[in-house]
């Protein structure tokens, strides 16, 4: 079994093909492990589709499945084109979402996330019990729960330096309380937003999270009146352009092909 490793906005993914749909949860945990496997934020299994150029099953590094991953969608789009699975402009199925891909330059990929849903606005008082003394989150008045394929809780701080002082235990508690990824962001100006994401499945801060960047983008646009196009800068410092077109969210940014790996003794460890 051959795996191709790609990176987008600091997220890295292993991509493989299968002609048969089955549970790859154990395989994902094994191959994504940073010390005992190849190491990646997630596993993408590309599958044939009758109605689309292809479809995928996406697994987080802990083996859990997710319907959508924004940065992985751009990576798999480039993979599909480079391996003659699909043309430069194509559509694939991610869970129940149709994802369109457009390759603008050799490594600049645009993908659409589709529609979003504002699930709730949450007064910070509901979250105070999770904060430690002198928490950097204490000055956040409102959190926003937004579904961009997966649920995200978004809060904005007033000082960029606070993004480097976030408490992992606080964010982990919020993650379990709301069963959502946690995003803390700072709006530097109307078109530039910095953020940090504590991600489900990774259970820690992640270098980037495409759906999290989308949730921050939407929250800033709706509640802070930022424009319909902005640059989002995650922990990796690899920026991503997000835009809103006809109520759909679009990503555009660079994707890198890293290399290829071949599965060996992992079969002996009970992955299947």
UniProtKB/Swiss-Prot annotation:
Example GO biological process: lysine biosynthetic process via diaminopimelate
Taxonomic placement: Bacteria, Pseudomonadati, Campylobacterota, Epsilonproteobacteria, Campylobacterales
Active site feature: 69, 209
PROSITE patterns hit by this protein: DAP_EPIMERASE
InterPro entries per the UniProt record, alphabetical: DAP_epimerase_AS, DAP_epimerase_DapF
Pfam family, one: DAP_epimerase
Record family assignment: Belongs to the diaminopimelate epimerase family.
A cellular component term, taken from the record's GO annotations: cytosol
Pathway linked to the protein: Amino-acid biosynthesis; L-lysine biosynthesis via DAP pathway; DL-2,6-diaminopimelate from LL-2,6-diaminopimelate: step 1/1
Binding site for substrate: 11, 60, 70-71, 181, 199-200, 210-211
Keyword terms, alphabetized: Amino-acid biosynthesis, Cytoplasm, Isomerase, Lysine biosynthesis
Gene (UniProt): dapF
EC number: 5.1.1.7
Catalytic activity: (2S,6S)-2,6-diaminopimelate = meso-2,6-diaminopimelate
Function description: Catalyzes the stereoinversion of LL-2,6-diaminopimelate (L,L-DAP) to meso-diaminopimelate (meso-DAP), a precursor of L-lysine and an essential component of the bacterial peptidoglycan.
Top-level lineage group: Bacteria
Protein name: Diaminopimelate epimerase
Subunit structure: Homodimer.
Protein localization: Cytoplasm
């Amino acid at each position: 079994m051959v795996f191709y490793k790609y990176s987008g906005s600091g997220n890295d993914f292993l991509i493989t093909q299968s002609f048969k749909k089955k549970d790859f949860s154990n395989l994902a945990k094994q191959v994504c492990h940073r010390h005992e496997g190849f190491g990646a934020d997630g596993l993408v299994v590309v599958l044939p589709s009758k109605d689309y150029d292809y479809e995928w099953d996406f697994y987080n590094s802990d083996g859990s499945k997710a319907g959508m991953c924004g940065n992985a969608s751009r990576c798999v789009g480039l993979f599909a084109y480079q391996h003659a699975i699909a043309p430069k402009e194509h559509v694939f199925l991610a869970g129940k979402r149709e994802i369109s891909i457009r390759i603008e330059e050799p490594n600049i990929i645009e993908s659409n996330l589709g529609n979003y849903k504002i699930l709730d606005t949450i007064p910070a008082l509901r979250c105070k019990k999770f904060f430690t003394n002198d928490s950097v989150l204490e000055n956040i008045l409102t959190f926003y729960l937004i579904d961009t394929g997966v649920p995200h809780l978004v809060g904005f701080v007033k000082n960029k330096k606070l993004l480097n002082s976030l408490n992992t235990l606080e964010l982990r508690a919020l993650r379990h309380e709301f069963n959502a990824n946690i995003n803390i962001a700072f709006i530097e100006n109307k078109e530039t937003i910095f953020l940090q994401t504590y991600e489900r499945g990774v259970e820690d801060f992640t270098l980037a999270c495409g759906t999290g960047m989308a949730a921050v983008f939407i929250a800033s646009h709706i509640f802070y009146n930022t424009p319909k196009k902005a640059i989002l800068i995650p922990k990796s410092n690899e920026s991503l352009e997000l835009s809103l077109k006809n109520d759909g969210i679009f990503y555009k940014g660079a994707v890198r092909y890293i290399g290829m790996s071949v599965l060996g003794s992992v079969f002996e460890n009970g992955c299947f």
